[in-house]
Amino acid sequence: MDTNYIIETKNLTKQYGSQKSVADLNIHVKRGRIYGLLGRNGAGKTTTMKMLLGLTKPTSGEVKIWGKSLQGNEKKLLPRIGSLIESPGFYPNLTATENLRIFATLRGVPNSHAIKDALDLVGLPYKDKKLFSQYSLGMKQRLAIALAVMHDPELLILDEPINGLDPIGIAEVRSFIRELCDARGKTILISSHILSEISLLADDIGIIDHGALLEEESLAELEQKSSKHIRFTLSNTAQAARILERNFHETHFSIQDDHNLRLHNMELPVGKIVTAFVENGLEVSEAHTCEESLEDYFKRVTGGEGIA
């Protein structure tokens, strides 16, 4: 396994009876980046995150964090991680500050300003008499995130952190998650079923469906795959690539398989390219312009059902 990854899994699997909730999952979370685990509800996101945190034991496979196996190193690794998995058990008759003070004591958080800093980050008041039981769903979600970051962890694992938030709240959460990564150097793994939010936030994306990882690439690479392009169907894509590089000094293309190639530079003359292919012995059966949205791409990858 590559020690350049903060999180790396190898064939991670969780099986309940005959049903695999997660199947042979291999994800790679890079240092100082936001990794978005994207999939519809029931795709296996929460189960994956629970295995990464030692809350659920894998049926098989391995989890490595900072290059070390999680199994046997939980006491060393887990204190360096902040997490939001489902809903924390806050006391309903205490304020946000009182709740966090209890958790700070249990965790031995030494920084006296940690509670206020965490509440400031998520936009909750430090001196507030409102009880947790009086909080809206969005405020409860903010407090859960404050708890996750209070001990200044190096790595954050957040399961659906924008659940229950209104559009303004979602934008604010997006902003401070981005700040945690860009300004404070945190590595963040975030899950969501909302494509539009992941595409606005993540640097790298893993698409999970029915427990299997379908794609894992940077957002820029995925956007290129779904952008406007010219698709060529021909007899030999490797030879076509050499012709594009030699005759047109062009490298902005991607080979899909032996017979399909995508050209991403829309300014090149298609007629001249086809002529060059034919003159060099290639059979060209199709050449046409395609435009696929990021949503269309995800629908295609997940078998047509799509993601919100």
Please report, for each region that a protein language model flagged, where it lies by residue.
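Alpha-helix N-cap/helix-start and coil->helix boundary motif
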Residues: 13, 97, 121, 195, ...
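ABC transporter nucleotide-binding domains
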Residues: 4-9, 14-190, 195-209, 213-215
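Non-catalytic alpha-helical coupling and interface elements of nucleotide-dependent molecular machines
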Residues: 105-108, 303-307
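Generic structural signal for individual residues within well-ordered alpha-helical segments
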Residues: 78, 100-101, 116-119, 171, ...
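ABC transporter nucleotide-binding domain
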Residues: 175-264
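Short coil/turn motifs at beta-sheet boundaries
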Residues: 2, 95, 138, 223-225, ...
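Short, Lys/Arg-enriched, disordered terminal segments
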Residues: 1-5, 304-308
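Short, charged/small-residue-rich alpha-helical element at the C-terminal edge
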Residues: 228-301, 308
